[in-house]
Each structure stands twice: as C-alpha cells, then as structure tokens.
Amino acid sequence: MRLTCFILFILLSAIACKSKEEWKTRSIYQIVTDRFARTSDTGTCNFNKYCGGNYRGIINKLDYIKGMGFNAIWISPILENLEDSYHGYHTTNFYKLNDHFGSEADFKELISLCHKNDIWVMVDVNANHVAPIGTDYEKIYPFNSSEHYHNWCEIYDWNNQMQVENCRIAQMPDLKQENDWVTETLLEWVHDLIQKYNIDGIRIDTAMSVPKWFWDQFRDSAGVFQIGEVFNENPGYVADYQRHLDSVFNYPLYYTIRDSFCGSFANLKDYWLHSRNIFPAPEYLGVFVENHDNFRFLFQCNDISKFTNAIIFSLLWEGIPVVYYGGEQYLSGGYDPYNREPLWDNYNTRSTLYQLIAKANYIRKTYNIWNNKIMQRYADENFYAFTRGNILACFTNEISLKRTITDHEFNIGDRLCNLLQEGDCVTVTGGGITISMGDYPKVYVKQ
C-alpha cells in the first residue's frame, strides 16, 4: 500500500522536469568533482584520495565550460562516502551530502548559477550498492540491516545475469530490491533528492546490476531524464535497458569508436549498418570517447589527430554527446585512478581541441542536427563521411589523404565550406565531392 500511494503521489506531483526530447539538444561535459577544479592551490594529489576539487571550483570555471559550448554538466555522486572515496561511489548515508565537495549551500549555488547560464546539471546516482563495509551494515544509513542486501557472493562471471544482479561488485554490499522496503525507500529518496535540489537529470551507475523491473519504477519516481550505465559491448544486451530507462550510454559505439579511430573504419561501417538499428531510440543514447571507468584515448592511441577526429565525431553523431573533462587539454591517463587526473592550471582556452569542440557544439545548435538522421556516405579503412541534415562530416584516422564522395544529395556546382577551418571550400562536380584531409576532421555546409 505504501508503494502504491507513493507512486500515485509522484504521478500527481507537478515537477519541472527536462524531458528526453529536451535533453537530446544538450551537450554534456563530464566532471569528476574532486579532480576538475579546486579553490586552494596548496597540496599535492594522491590519486587514491581526495585532491581538493569542489563545487566552488566548478562555479569558478563555468565560463571555461561555456566557452566550449557545453550546456550541461554531469558531476560525481554527491552523497556522504567512506573516507578517501573521492569518486563518490561508496555511499554511507543516502541523506547527507559529501562535505569534501563543499557545503549544501555551495551545491545549491552551483545548480542555481548553472541554470542562470543555461547549463543543466546531471547528478550521478547509485541504487545498486553501498560502501564496501563487509557485513558492518550499521555503518550504512538507512540500509543498516542484512535483510536489506542480497547474500554475500562476488561476481565472477559477467555473462551470468543472476550473479550480475545479486552479487557484489568489488565487495560492495548489493541492495536487495526484492525487499519492498528497500525499493520504496530508494524510490522516495531519488524523488526527494531531485525535488530538493532542482536537479535536471541523473546518470545511473551500474544499471545492469539491478533488475529491469526496478528501473521502470525508478524512472517514474525520478521524474527527470535518466541515462544508465550498462557496461557491455553487446548492442542487444545494452539496448534492452533503454526499454526501462530514458537512455543508456552507448558502450557498443564506444568500443567501435576506439577500434575505428585507432584502427579501421570498417568497424564503424558495420556498426551503422547493423548495431545502431537494435536500439529503440538511438537519438537519446549517450555518445562518448572517454569516461572515468576507462583509460583515456591518448593512453591507448597516442595520436592527437586521431583523438581530435574521434571527439568531434562524438559531438556530431546521433545521440547526446558526453565529453570527459580534460580531454580538451589532451590528458592521457591510464587505468583507474590515473584516468582521473587533476586538471589544475591546465585550462587553456587556446588549445586546438578546446576551440574545435566549441565550433562543433556551435554546429550542433545552429543546424539543430538532433532533428536529422545519419546517412553514411563513405567508409573505407582510413576515411569516413556522413551527412546529417545540412552538414557533411568527414573524418580520418590517417593524415594527408584524398577521397571523392559520390553518394550525396548536393547539386553540381554547389560550393561547400568547412565550418571548422575558414577558407577551406570545395565545389561539387559531376564526379562527386573531392575531400583532401589533413590532421583534423572537416564539417562542410552549402554556402
């Protein structure tokens, strides 16, 4: 009865929420709160502990974020954590904020100032597990009893869904959503959190480790846009979670991007022909090249040209782009925690990638590209091109090559100019559109 009444309350509540249709027009800058910006210049950074980044630091760098054209940020989980758990995924109290990141007033001011600057705020949340406290459940609030958790087992086989949903990730106690009180409490918690702080959207950690039926209820309780982490390269497996949440991160495309820009575009051609059609709504998927769970692109593939092509591709492809902080400054950290390096004193607004990201975001907004489908126009091992509405986007994983695109809808004599580089124009001939690629991608529009 309690759960039924709460769901009815949610349905009757009038909350100002940003829909998935609105979110697909946004471009997201992902921030690890402890590593993006701090307000004190003292102290070194031990990557396994807090380094001093906070909400006030983000506030001070809003112009830096806006300068790249981003109109949404995704920040780390905000709740109280075990000491040294700078990342935010070791929750100890679901009703207290993490004071390492600042006060509640600081957090509210961050959201208020973001909204004044037309920047939406996405908060990372977790409904799967708590801090790794063994069986000392009294250390967790409000889930302070063994009955709130599945029996202790570790995940050894990620292809075994029973283990994925019921066992522990890295020894973190796994919440038991089959317990009505646990589910009711989580639903009320996320609803109240969003209402209290006027949060615009949520990123859901480890979505694949919770039964799908729970996400149907969680989605309704949240009342704002949700995008879930389903860390898997199988398109069918990932796509099924989009039937229970507004969106998921496009991990199959993530692997394809890395393979394509560091290897052969044959992978991307195959993705476009087959994998993308498996998703119920690809226009809402999170598109990314890097994040806090994976080594940075430049660690795997130490080539700034290839990285630049990949980032601009992610901003123009179908879906909601998410750029990981520091990519614009060519951070190249390896495995966790070195992929979460501090950005201190490295806010160069003249870096080539910073400026190209700004131009790509300008193109997104100016041409409303989210209203248009992708049409693949050319694909071989080293060159890839697609049209999306009025734009022709061209990418390379090898510098100094020339290709002629014959599959297009432009007219002979049309003059196309590259919005990423002034003065770079081509004319459509009877033979097609001949593109000469250098280090960087090209985005042409008809003049």
Language model features: what each stretch is:
Residues 36, 119, 294, 319, ...:
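Generic structural signal for secondary-structure transition and capping sites
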Residues 111, 115, 188-288, 302-305, ...:
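Active-site-proximal helices and loops of the catalytic beta/alpha 8
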Residues 1-4:
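Positively charged n-region of N-terminal signal peptides that target proteins for export
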Residues 27-32, 72-77, 93-95, 120-124, ...:
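Structural recognition of the beta-strand scaffold that forms the well-ordered cores
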Residues 127, 289-296:
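Active-site neighborhood of divalent metal-dependent phosphoester/pyrophosphate hydrolases
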Residues 9-16:
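Hydrophobic h-region of N-terminal signal peptides that target proteins for export
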Residues 38, 91, 96-99, 171, ...:
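Generic structural "secondary-structure junction" signal
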Residues 19-27, 32-197, 212-228, 235-237, ...:
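Substrate-binding/active-site clefts of carbohydrate-active enzymes
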